[in-house]
């Protein structure tokens, strides 16, 4: 499965890493995402059967779209991501790096399963990434490790545009107002009014 292959390649880094310098790694998983060339979700083998009895979220159930058909594969993709993040965490622990590593899990958008905004000006493509619907606004952003400890949930709206400034701050670089966004540690610790 694609997420397994991408994680395999990321884990190969540790086969040659000597631990002498800090490292920065980006793993860009594609899942959970519909297959652009096919227009539907494809979870790992067995997803349709394994997740067929999961109840659709109410907002999807009441709208027209393809969620009833696609949701099991979507959940399979989410489970695959979870499994592969677990593989990364286990390798970091095995290498003795976990306690000194910050993991940022972020997404660019969610899915609405073709329930809204199929616009003619986009030649039939969905416009949900650029809307104010939950699928575009309420997406995962989890930061764990380093100074991010304790499991705080931030209710305020934040943006991924703050990630570069946050990552630089983790490396000890204060860019002040030279970049957009905020250091998200300040947001989590309620040190900012923004």
Q: Across the structure, where does each feature detected by a protein language model lie?
A:
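Aromatic- and acidic-residue-enriched carbohydrate-binding clefts of CAZyme catalytic domains
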Residues: 44-69, 124-127
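Histidine-centered active-site microenvironments of extracellular/periplasmic hydrolases
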Residues: 37-46, 93-152, 159
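Active-site regions of oxyanion-processing enzymes, predominantly non-cytosolic
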Residues: 3-57, 93-102
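A structural signal for well-ordered alpha-helical segments within the folded catalytic domains
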Residues: 4-8, 72, 76-86, 136-137, ...
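C-terminal cap/loop subdomain of S1 sulfatases and analogous C-terminal strand-loop tails that border
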Residues: 111-122, 149, 162-164, 169-194
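Active-site rim elements
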Residues: 64-78, 126-129, 147-158, 171-175
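Short, solvent-exposed loop/turn segments at secondary-structure junctions
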Residues: 2, 29-34, 109-112, 148-149, ...
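Beta-strand elements within well-structured catalytic alpha/beta cores of enzymes
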Residues: 23-29, 77-81, 85-88, 102-108, ...
């Amino acid at each position: 499965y694609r997420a397994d292959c991408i994680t395999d390649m990321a884990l190969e880094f540790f086969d040659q890493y000597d631990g002498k310098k800090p490292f920065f790694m980006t793993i860009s998983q594609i899942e959970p995402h519909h297959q652009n060339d096919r227009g539907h979700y494809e979870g790992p083998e067995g997803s349709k059967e394994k997740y067929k009895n999961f109840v659709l979220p109410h907002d999807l159930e009441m709208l027209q779209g393809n969620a009833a058909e696609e949701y099991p594969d979507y959940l399979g993709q989410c489970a695959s991501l979870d499994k592969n993040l677990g593989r990364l965490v286990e390798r970091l622990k095995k290498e003795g790096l976990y306690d000194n590593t910050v993991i940022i899990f972020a997404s660019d958008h969610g899915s609405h399963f073709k329930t809204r905004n199929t616009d003619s000006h986009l030649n039939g493509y969905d416009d949900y990434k650029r809307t104010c619907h939950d699928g575009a606004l309420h997406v995962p952003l989890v930061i764990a490790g380093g100074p991010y400890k304790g499991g705080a949930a931030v209710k305020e709206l934040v943006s991924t545009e703050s990630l570069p400034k946050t990552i630089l701050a983790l490396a000890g670089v204060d860019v002040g107002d030279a970049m957009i966004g905020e250091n998200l540690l300040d947001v989590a610790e309620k040190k900012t009014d923004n």
